[in-house]
Regions:
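Short, surface-exposed, polar/charged, turn-prone segments marking secondary-structure boundaries
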Residues: 150, 172-174, 264-267, 276
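Juxtamembrane/transmembrane-helix interface segments of polytopic membrane transporters
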Residues: 251, 255-274
Length: 351
């Protein structure tokens, strides 16, 4: 019977997660890990999305009041003209805004790349010291940052190229070209791009420890991981499946925890409001001054609590990947192990 490494690594990941977080519990360590994971993002960051709304739910398919092609062409031409005038009028401000957004995005992206190495060092050694790990991984973070941006720029270029035929026709005023079929290349490129990026980032996730502990660059580490994976295809496929299932389970669990904490926060807010009302405070008289600030403070505090409580999830996932990787590179990662105290020798009974 085949020994699936990814399945066997689950128990070890649970054990190591318990050791780093609860044996013993260290609040300072938790706070440092929360800071690291905040910059990395992912599970525990408190981000969420709402995809339940449908703007077409009421009248989708009702073309009784549809416009003629001539009216649509005129509308598109007028819209393009107005946008062009706006862009030419505020070109300087638009360029400055884009540059600022790109600069801030690049800065946080570099910090996120750098924190990937800080995170690996922290969980491998069970010693979280952010500044020391940052100083020793500035170059590694830059290499990962460059690769990350290269991949996403290539993906963005592919998306733009897939939409060029439809966009060029629309800019020329040919609205009839904007059919569903004209966007099929976009959907194909988008889906294939997401799949390819997911595979690449799965290997990058495994390559980061190789970079750290074999002192090689990102491309060399990726080459080593991909070469080893090519000889263990069934293990890699099972690894991806188990990681996907674990990600779904952890995502659902994190969502449930978030909902429970939000519900508790709402109950606390209602209780505080009722107590203040009974004490004679008229909050609505100052709602325009207090409520926005109180709501913002409460939202930030709640997001931090959710992020803090869900810290074990990304740590477990990182340990799972590291233990899977250790089956390929048994000697490269200096895993911290708990020191067991020797059992006291039995005292001989007096004769």
């Amino acid at each position: 019977m085949t020994n699936w490494i990814a399945w066997a690594a689950i128990e070890g990941a649970l054990t190591k997660t318990k050791q780093i977080l609860f044996e013993p519990f260290d609040l300072t360590k938790w706070v440092k890990l929360a800071i690291i994971l905040f910059f990395i993002g992912g599970i525990g960051s408190g981000s969420s999305g709402n995809f339940s709304s449908n703007p077409f739910s009421g009248n989708f398919g009702d073309f009784g009041n549809s416009y003629s092609d001539a009216e649509l062409d005129a509308f598109v031409t007028e819209t393009v003209s107005e946008v062009s005038v706006f862009v030419h009028q505020y070109m300087t401000y638009i360029v400055l805004a884009v540059l600022v957004i790109l600069l801030v995005t690049a800065l946080f992206s570099y910090i996120s790349s750098l924190m990937q190495f800080v995170f690996v060092e922290s969980v491998v050694r069970n010693h979280v010291t952010i500044r020391a790990y940052i100083r020793s991984n500035l170059g590694n973070g830059l290499r990962l940052f460059i690769l990350d941006w290269t991949l996403w720029i290539a993906f963005l270029i592919a998306i733009i190229l897939s939409m060029l035929p439809a966009l060029s026709s629309a800019l020329d005023g040919d609205v009839s070209a904007l059919s569903f079929g004209s966007f099929i290349p976009f959907f194909i490129v988008f889906v294939l791009g997401i799949i390819i990026l997911s595979i690449i980032y799965s290997f990058i996730n495994l390559a980061i420890p190789v970079m750290l502990y074999e002192n090689v660059g990102i491309l060399k580490a990726l080459s080593k991981v991909a070469s080893t994976a090519a000889h263990s295809v069934p293990q890699v496929l099972v690894y991806w499946i188990i990681r996907g299932v674990l990600g779904i389970i952890i995502g659902i669990t994190a969502a449930i925890i978030s909902i429970i904490l939000i519900f508790i926060a709402v109950l606390i807010g209602i209780a505080v409001y009722m107590i203040l009302t009974l004490l004679g405070f008229r909050l609505f008289d100052m709602s325009h001054l207090l409520m926005p600030r109180l709501f913002l403070f409460a939202a930030i505090l709640l997001a931090f609590i959710i992020h803090f409580v869900t810290i074990p999830f990304p740590i477990f996932m990182r340990y799972h990947a590291l233990l899977f990787l250790r089956s390929w590179y048994a000697d490269i990662m200096p895993f911290w192990e708990p020191v067991t105290e020797p059992a006291p020798e039995p005292v001989p009974e007096p004769a």
